[in-house]
């Protein structure tokens, strides 16, 4: 999906004790991603949906540089053979941004991620909640009790623990803040899609 769906996060918060190791492994994996024909099963990254959307996504790269960020991988266009007219771009990783920057708090809908370190549970919760959006997030930890505690403190409609995009149509789907109102899924869908009618009669 090239980061173009609502459930794709555009920032990763990394505990400072593993920050450098995680960053280096993330860069290595991102640079290995195969960009090309989406009908090829070995392809991992396809084209963006349109030229206008690519311009919008790339504008966030320019904004990140203006905000003091550093592009640590990505940015160059990829033009796979036979698909030169596509809206290609390599996934971008940005570090060095303030957690309050626009690039770190807005929805980008493209293959861009900002990375940030944190040193405490309260700090990561504060950073996670420092956005106008709240649809979904993912927590990765070997300490499930801590992960559950943090999940309950994050102002988001959905939190995955040690997984991502794991959907069950029987459970509620929806966000908070600017990420929407109400829930779909299971019995919640009946309320969401129902249109109750009120008929009021005055009797003499």
Q: What are the functions of these language-model segments?
A:
Residues 34, 81-204:
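Conserved C-terminal structural/oligomerization subdomain of aldehyde/semialdehyde dehydrogenase
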Residues 1-98, 161:
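ALDH superfamily catalytic-core signature
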């Amino acid at each position: 999906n090239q980061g173009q769906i609502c459930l794709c996060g555009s920032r990763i918060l990394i505990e400072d004790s593993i920050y450098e190791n995680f960053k280096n492994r993330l860069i290595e994996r991102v640079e290995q991603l195969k960009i090309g024909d989406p009908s090829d099963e070995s392809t991992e990254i396809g084209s963006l949906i349109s030229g206008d959307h690519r311009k919008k996504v790339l504008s966030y790269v320019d904004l990140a540089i203006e905000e003091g960020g550093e592009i640590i991988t990505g940015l160059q266009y990829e033009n796979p053979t036979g698909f030169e007219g596509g809206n290609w771009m390599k996934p971008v990783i940005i570090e060095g941004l303030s957690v309050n920057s626009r690039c770190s708090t807005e929805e980008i809908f493209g293959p861009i991620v900002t990375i940030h370190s944190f040193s405490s549970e309260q700090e990561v919760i504060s950073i996670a909640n420092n956005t106008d959006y709240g649809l979904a997030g993912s927590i990765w930890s070997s300490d499930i009790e801590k992960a559950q505690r943090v999940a309950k403190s994050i102002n988001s409609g959905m939190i995955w623990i040690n997984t991502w995009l794991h959907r069950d149509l029987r459970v509620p789907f929806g966000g908070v803040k600017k990420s929407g109102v109400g829930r779909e899924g299971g019995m919640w869908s009946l309320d969401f899609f129902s249109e109750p009618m009120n008929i009021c009669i005055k009797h003499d």
